[in-house]
Curated annotation (Swiss-Prot):
GO terms for biological process: viral replication complex formation and maintenance. Necessary for the efficient intracellular multiplication of tobamoviruses. It comes from Arabidopsis thaliana (Mouse-ear cress). This is Tobamovirus multiplication protein 2B. The gene is TOM2B. Disruption phenotype: Reduced efficiency of intracellular multiplication of tobamoviruses (e.g. crucifer strain TMV-Cg). It comes from the Eukaryota.
Amino acid sequence: MATASENSRGISGGDRTAKAVVADQISQAVNSTANLLHLMRQSSSSQAQLAKLPKNLLAKASLTKATGQALAQLPQVISSLDAHIESGLHSGVHLNTVTQLLENMESTQLRALRQSNISPVV
């Protein structure tokens, strides 16, 4: 079922890309972390742990942006990898043929050498 924000943007569940899903999850994680920090500030017992956390979540924005860029490139990387694997599978058939031809050549040459060594010299 689509959320209110998805409906307002005209996005149905089936139309969402992996990038949009991950972006939403990152946004939810940031909001959850901000809410947790707010609750921790209200609790005096968590002040020591709070001091260990980053002062500003926006300092992590570059990491989030880099993650988004990597996610944007993933479909192309997967497609390229798939093409290379497919090519490799087709090459495997050719490799078997070449291997068989080389084995036949080697066998023929060895047979010829044996016959030349066995033949009487006149």
